Design a protein with these regions (language model features):
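Active-site HxH/HxHxD metal-binding segment of metal-dependent hydrolases
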Residues: 10-11, 24, 29-109, 194
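Active-site-flanking alpha-helical
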Residues: 60-61, 119-120, 137, 175
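Active-site-adjacent loop/tail segments of enzyme domains
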Residues: 136-162
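Divalent metal-coordination and catalytic microenvironments
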Residues: 18, 28, 53, 65, ...
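Core dinuclear metal-dependent hydrolase active-site scaffold
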Residues: 6, 17-19, 96-121, 125-126, ...
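Accessory terminal helices/loops
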Residues: 153-163, 172-263
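Active-site metal-binding loops of divalent metal-dependent hydrolases
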Residues: 29-31, 54, 81-82, 113-114, ...
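Conserved beta-strand hairpin/beta-sheet module of binuclear metal-dependent hydrolase folds
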Residues: 1-44, 118-133
């Protein structure tokens, strides 16, 4: 059985730590110390590091881990150019990574947040990096709104039972934005209550699920009439279709603060 643990890093990052017996895999280790500390609790061998994209808060701990850990060197997987490690195993759309005999991840290209962004999809689980968050999605740093829209839509077509492990704890801020767009959405209110309780107890709000995101995430709900109307009011013009709505929402969210009204 694969155990998945969230290792907090920086202010709001999560490094996802996958363990099977003494072996472990980490995804997006922006810092080395949380990984080393967790390895000391009985997981003696880090066998692989997976990277979703090149931002430093996802890759910053790789070099230190490679230099400081005893035993065989972990394999490092990621998009081309994500890290200077000469042993980087470059992966892209459609590739598979078999981490254990019974556990394989498929690589999905999901550009938008960055052009090189990858997600890792396994049996009923997804590691989307900074492409999809709970009740939100990543900012545009390199790609276009159209690319990010297509990537989010693609992930949204995964089975509803898919557990989603984003790389940041942004849930409450995202739900504040979502609730302003859909004040009558009881599922958003229910989830906000659960998420608030989790954070008060210093617990992650994650993983989420694809079905939950279809219920609460405005970036997966651009075809909903209420979302469309809210985006049109904000833009002050008629919006032609889901991509136009998504584009307005993404730009709007960039400047949103939790106490700012959206209606």
């Amino acid at each position: 059985m694969i155990e998945i643990t969230a290792l907090p890093a920086f202010r709001d990052n999560y490094i996802w730590f996958l363990a099977r017996g003494p072996e472990a895999v980490v995804i997006d280790p922006g810092e080395a110390e949380p990984v080393r500390r967790h390895l000391a609790h009985g997981h003696s061998h880090l066998k692989a590091i997976l990277l979703t994209h090149h931002h430093g808060d996802h890759t910053g701990g790789v070099e230190e881990l490679l230099a400081s850990l005893p035993g065989p060197r972990p394999a490092v997987y990621g998009p081309d150019g994500v890290h200077p490690d000469p042993g980087l195993r470059r992966v892209g759309e459609g590739d598979s990574i078999r981490l254990w005999p019974e556990f394989e991840l498929t690589v999905l290209a999901v550009p938008g947040h960055t052009l090189d962004h990858l997600a890792y999809c396994g049996p009923d689980l997804l590691f989307p990096g900074d492409t999809l968050f709970s009740a939100g999605c990543g900012r545009l740093f390199e790609g276009t709104a159209g690319q990010l829209f297509d990537s989010v839509e693609r992930l949204g077509r995964l089975p509803g039972t898919t557990r989603v492990y984003p790389a940041h704890e942004y849930t409450l801020a995202n739900l504040a934005f979502a609730s302003g767009l859909e004040p009558g959405n009881a599922l958003i209110a229910q989830y906000a209550s659960l998420a608030t309780s989790a954070r008060m107890n210093q617990q992650p709000t994650l993983p989420t699920s694809i079905q939950r995101e279809h219920d609460v995430n405005p970036f997966l709900r651009t075809r909903e009439a209420g979302i469309h109307r809210a985006a049109e009011r904000h833009a002050g013009r008629v919006l032609d279709g889901p991509l136009a709505v998504f584009t307005v929402l993404r730009k709007w969210k960039d400047s949103f603060t939790m106490n700012q009204p959206t209606a």
